[in-house]
Amino acid sequence: MRNLTLLTDLYELTMMQGYFKTDNNRTVIFDAFHRKNPCDGAYAISCGLEQVIDYIKNLHFTEDDIAYLRSLSIFDEDFLEYLSNFHFTGDIYAIPEGTVIFPREPIVKIIAPIMEAQLVETAILNIINHQSLIATKAARVCYAAKGDGIMEFGLRRAQGPDAGIYGARAAVIAGCVGTSNVLTGQMFGVPVKGTHAHSWIMSFPDEYTAFKTYADLYPDACILLVDTYDTLRSGVPNAIRVFKEMREKGIDLKGYGIRLDSGDLAYLTKKARKMLDDAGFEDAIISASSDLDEYLIDSLKTQGAAITSWGVGTNLITSKDNPAFGGVYKLAAVMGDDGTFIPKIKLSENSEKITNPGNKTVYRVYDADGMIKADLIALADETYDESQPLLLFDPVETWKKTLMEPGEYSMREIMVKVFDKGECVYDSPNVMDIQKYCKQEQATLWDESKRLINPQVVHVDLSQKLYDLKQELLHNYGREKL
């Protein structure tokens, strides 16, 4: 477990010293949330909570940390002494990993003294933003493949080792069947996948010898890369020759097939499929890679490409077309002298950047078929009775309303307590269990909300009490109703 305490922006520490010097360490509430889904999609996938937990558990300043901060000539000795005994004492609530999430709802909620809550901002956003981005991208890629296996192959193109390790973790959570990243496999117990490179073929006197040698070594996982020289005139015929020889030796062919990494994948795979089928290898896998993303996979599926397994690298591990997840961390409440929270709101000329005040939680509302109808952000002390009608309304265009009668809906609170007074009270599931949960979550989204282009938006509504509180604060600040 690494100590990432100094993985923070300098201004978090200068603000901490300011709070320390002014004796202002009252308890506050911060919300981490995102304003816009990646890739113009209708949803995102929450990911990274396990690493947030590890970070908080190991949060402390070492002697070397203190010495470095002292060398900056910014911090006074009394503040450095405070840091030398620092540990997290607050509460954390979060939406579990693998959950489908939507804009403006809290993903992580911190309730802690302001110096503690301020310090952890940067690292929490760094972890959640990265893994939620890659998980969301992977979910889109898996959806485009329509049930075919997606393998994460992006390590060499990731923006550094950590991005490769944790990006692969996020990709598997969102639905990838495995990763080429061996260290991720070791760390998180996820399946590792791989075949061979063009260099393997080129290192032998000829393609057939390369294929035969590989098949002799790995008869139970014999996927042969057929595009080193000429896919249809050399690669596929040589692969078929090797498969025939394996069958003649009595080898029970399983997990075998070919991979293409270049060329017109729709044309080549259809031709290769016919060649394999005509030779009696109808169950041979055809795998493809070559700068794939969800849009190209969708196009290839539409064209009838004979691909059943996909290796996706650069465009997945970097989320190349949308390389950042816009998570933010905003103050929602400050504890007053009487021990109650005073709600706070951040104003903006852009209405979507006006925050939701107070101590909040999130409820998921399902229709009678178990599909997501909406999410409802409510104040933490609110409760709901499913035997009563539920009124949902758009928090901006308030005339848009839906009344759900008992029996037409169900609800569940999707935030869970993770830390209580600095102690972790949450057991993180293993990655494959999170993947199973994530698949169940995605199954509650309508296909219209999962489509790649112009998806149907899932509404995130406010409870009446939260809406009224927000309007009251806006009125107090002289703003018109929003």
Predicted regions and their residues:
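An N-terminal, globular interaction/scaffold subdomain
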Residues: 54-59, 94-97, 101
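Buried, small/hydrophobic-residue-enriched core segments of structured protein domains
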Residues: 1-27, 36-38, 74, 80-89, ...
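Gly/Ser/Thr/Ala-enriched C-terminal appendages of enzymes
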Residues: 1-26, 39-41, 279, 292-482
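Short coil/turn segments at secondary-structure boundaries
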Residues: 67-68, 136-140, 154, 450-457
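Structural motif
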Residues: 149-152, 191-194, 221-224, 256-257, ...
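N-terminal, Lys/Arg-enriched amphipathic/low-complexity engagement segments
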Residues: 28-84
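Short amphipathic C-terminal alpha-helix that caps PH/PH-like domains
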Residues: 56, 120, 124-128, 438, ...
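Short acidic, Pro/Gly- and aromatic-enriched capping/linker segments at domain boundaries
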Residues: 92-98, 411-414
